[in-house]
Amino acid sequence: MSRLLDVMERLRKDCPWDREQTTESLRTNTLEEVYELSDAILSGRPEEVKKELGDVLLHIVFYSTIGEEQGTFDLCDVANTLCNKLIYRHPHVYGEAVAASAGAVVERWEELKQQEKGGNKTVLSGVPASLPTLIKAYRIQDKARGVGFDWEQPEDVWTKVDEELRELREAITSGSAEDSEAELGDFLFSVINVARKYGINPDNALERTNAKFIRRFGYVEAKAKEAGRSLRDMTLAEMDALWDEAKRLESQP
């Protein structure tokens, strides 16, 4: 870590690009690096995860170095603030409190987080506005669950999904674009609730499906190219046949 800090100090002095960066200019790059880390994790390749973790760490050091230059905070301040928070929010580890389950730990975490804000923070105010919409919906639902606003049984969510699907169909049939958009949002929100109630990460689930579609469609495209065909000139039945072939190959041991 000391070596990394020395490298960053040198870059801030001698590299024109690094020298002109600010917390604002780095923000979008930081988001990109976090998404690349997410991709590496989903790929299951430890070497890629290690590499992308380094890129994210670079940004943490970058922000901390800028803070130190401005006299507001340094990396030690960041680490100590984090340590203090972790110790405070884990009274079952560093104190006398008892947590019988992971769920109890999360509930206590939220209670302590609320107390840190003097009790003036609303339940949902801790959900970042800039979160991707799917993740934001999950976090909103989970925050509400933390105070008891949730379906009593997982099966109850299916009734809500059926209700929202019916309302979506009715809105689309009516031809109202505004109503259709609103009902589609309600339907998607209810589907995310299903995922949450059954312990499924909806973002991971959708990303795996995205990857599966890209993989299978790539197979269709490659086979068409081998045959000297263009996808635009193929019938849907021909493309479906190649798609099914890709599925069969994936299912083979």
Name what the model sees in each region:
Residues 1-53, 58-184, 188-253:
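Flexible "arm" and connector segments at domain edges
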